[in-house]
Curated annotation (Swiss-Prot):
Protein name, entry field: Large ribosomal subunit protein uL15
GO molecular function list: structural constituent of ribosome
UniProt-listed InterPro entries: Rbsml_uL15_N, Ribosomal_uL15, Ribosomal_uL15/eL18, Ribosomal_uL15/eL18_sf, Ribosomal_uL15_CS
Pfam family membership, one: Ribosomal_L27A
A single BP term in Gene Ontology: translation
Keywords from the UniProt entry: Cytoplasm, Ribonucleoprotein, Ribosomal protein
Source organism: Xenopus laevis
SUPFAM superfamilies: Ribosomal proteins L15p and L18e (SSF52080)
Amino acid sequence: MPSKLRKTRKLRGHVSHGHGRIGKHRKHPGGRGNAGGMHHHRINFDKYHPGYFGKVGMRHYHLKKNQSFCPTINLDKLWTLVSEQTRLNHAKNLEGPAPIIDAVHAGYYKVLGKGKLPKQPVIVKAKFFSRKAEEKIKSVGGACVLGA
């Protein structure tokens, strides 16, 4: 026979079975959710969630984030913004209206002048154009449209 009884056997006949008479082994003894992170659950939070509590650094109240945000695209990549079919259709029919390439709609604000354009007119819409880009677009008979 074992010399020690298990706790459950010892507690037979005792009404509350070791769980007290008020709480009666119910509800949320440690609090709900993240309760006690700075107090009775501190060890767990420090070990598994370091840096969860507290502040770091100073706050800038009127910070304007990235005012110089200006994605760019070069002339040699400009025709990738419209489909190849569109380019071929307008290359055949040079008398009709020139295709419009909206760089801002594609997420680019400024058009830069690297590369060459095919010899067909095109209307380019953007917020900014470099001097060379504007010259090259106009040299193939196109136009630059500034948009806000």
